[in-house]
Curated annotation (Swiss-Prot):
UniProt record, GO biological process: negative regulation of hippo signaling
Protein name stated in the entry: Suppressor of IKBKE 1
Function field: Physiological suppressor of IKK-epsilon and TBK1 that plays an inhibitory role in virus- and TLR3-triggered IRF3. Inhibits TLR3-mediated activation of interferon-stimulated response elements (ISRE) and the IFN-beta promoter. May act by disrupting the interactions of IKBKE or TBK1 with TICAM1/TRIF, IRF3 and RIGI. Does not inhibit NF-kappa-B activation pathways. Associates with the striatin-interacting phosphatase and kinase (STRIPAK) core complex, forming the extended (SIKE1:SLMAP)STRIPAK complex.
Coiled coil stretches, renumbered: 70-102, 162-192
Species of origin: Rattus norvegicus (Rat)
Recorded name of the encoding gene: Sike1
Amino acid sequence: MSCTIEKILTDAKTLLERLREHDAAAESLVDQSAALHRRVAAMREAGAVLPEQYQEDASDVKDMSKYKPHILLSQENTQIRDLQQENRELWVSLEEHQDALELIMSKYRKQMLQLMVAKQAVDAEPVLKAHQSHSAEIESQIDRICEMGAVMRRAVQVDDNQFCKIQEKLAQLELENKELRELLSISSESLQVGKESSVAPEAQTIR
């Protein structure tokens, strides 16, 4: 798909370059044709003014005859015909350029349509793939979070159980310590009473 898009873009770029070239050539032909029209109009005006000058001044006709006006007019007519032929050729060339432009534009529109369709297809596919990838990634993250939550719950339960056991052990140790202290206190009192009891008979004997 990417190769097709690259080819379409390359073809479209080529068509645009050709379009610019033909457009420039067509503008040049139009300018040349307009210049020829002006030259033909100027020559026709000159040809129309020349006989009027002959009629206005008859004496000048004799003087002008030495310049062979008929030959001059014939030459001008030949030039006009040549210019008209050149103008026709230019217009034919211009029409060919216009046909080429229409063909290029038709191909360009077709290429752009294919490009738009291809881009829509390509744009949809990555979005779908990205959506699927993101969905899979999110599902994986959810699974990992659930696993971590289960581990944390087990750890909390273990900590709670361990804390309870420690608390029970501490309570037991405190109780045992208290009992030992009580026993120690009882033993100490018993010893003290025993000593006092033994000391009393000895004192009576000495007396």
